[in-house]
């Protein structure tokens, strides 16, 4: 029979609860010379999971990264996809799917060809796909009550310039240390952020429940990333204080 009026007016559950969009600037620590830019969209879904779409233009290195990450409500990776251009050439693309304690990766590149790899993964780990937008998620499983330097697990994806190496990853230990809360001001505004140190050499200022990176500094490389713009919509989006 014909659908009822009630059926016609039924609205399906929303796929998106909230969304953040922004851009980073990569610059030298010495004099602020522009090294690249990165744009992202962070989406909070109705099931509590989150996804990140990231476009990183590393113009100083002739590189361009297109990355998608999806994690569950506890920040455990579900799916990831990455396409890397390095040194002006297409390195390839990789698909990463997690089911239980297995991560299955498939890579295809013009030089490396088609390759696949299965990796056993722990209950708590993160994926390192290299855009700074996703780096805050490496801190999600840090236990602040325990404190100190903690060894977490990182699945690091190869984004190097060698086109013969596939876009596959390796499970590695990642040391993470919590350094306290700090107010930090960047072009996007002023944030009360949590400061972490990754691998003893990368300081991150992470903000809010979505673990958004506000600033990242790598002194050994002489590089800093700062959040330049931020816009949000949806539930429980906290807006930062704007610079005056």
Segment roles from a protein language model:
Residues 222-244:
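Short, low-complexity, Pro/Ser/Thr/Gly-rich segments in the mature regions of secreted, periplasmic
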Residues 63-65, 177-178, 199-201:
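Short, small/polar residue-rich loop motifs at catalytic or cofactor-binding pockets
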Residues 10-27, 42, 48-49, 54, ...:
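Mixed-charge, low-complexity segments
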Residues 1-10:
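Bacterial Sec-dependent signal peptides at the C-terminal "C-region" and cleavage site
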Residues 76-79, 189-228:
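Extended soluble regions of mature proteins
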Residues 71, 184-185, 206-207:
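Hydrophobic alpha-helical segments, especially N-terminal targeting/anchoring helices
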Residues 11-35, 98-191:
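Solvent-exposed helix/loop surface patches that form functional interfaces
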Residues 28-111, 211-218:
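N-terminal mature ectodomain segment of secretory-pathway/periplasmic proteins
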């Amino acid at each position: 029979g014909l659908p009822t009026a009630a059926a016609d007016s039924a609205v399906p559950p929303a796929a998106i609860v909230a969304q953040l969009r922004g851009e980073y600037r990569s610059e030298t620590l010495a004099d602020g010379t522009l090294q690249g830019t990165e744009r992202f969209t962070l989406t909070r879904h109705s099931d509590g999971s989150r996804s990140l779409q990231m476009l990183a233009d590393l113009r100083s290195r002739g590189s361009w990264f297109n990355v998608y990450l999806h994690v569950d409500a506890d920040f455990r990776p579900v799916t990831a996809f990455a396409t890397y251009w390095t040194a002006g050439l297409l390195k390839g693309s990789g698909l990463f799917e997690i089911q239980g304690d297995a991560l299955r990766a498939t890579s295809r590149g013009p030089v490396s060809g088609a390759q696949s790899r299965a990796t056993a993964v722990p209950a708590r780990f993160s994926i390192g796909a290299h855009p700074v937008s996703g780096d805050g998620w490496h801190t999600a499983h840090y236990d602040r009550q325990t404190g100190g330097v903690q060894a977490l697990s990182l699945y690091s994806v190869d984004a190097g310039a060698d086109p013969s190496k596939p876009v596959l990853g390796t499970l590695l230990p990642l040391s993470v240390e919590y350094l306290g809360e700090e107010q930090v001001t960047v072009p996007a505004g002023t944030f009360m952020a949590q400061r972490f140190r990754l691998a003893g050499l990368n300081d991150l200022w992470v903000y809010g429940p979505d673990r958004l990176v506000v600033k990242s500094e790598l002194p050994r490389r002489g590089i800093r990333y700062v959040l330049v713009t931020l816009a949000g919509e949806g539930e429980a989006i906290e807006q930062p204080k704007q610079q005056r």
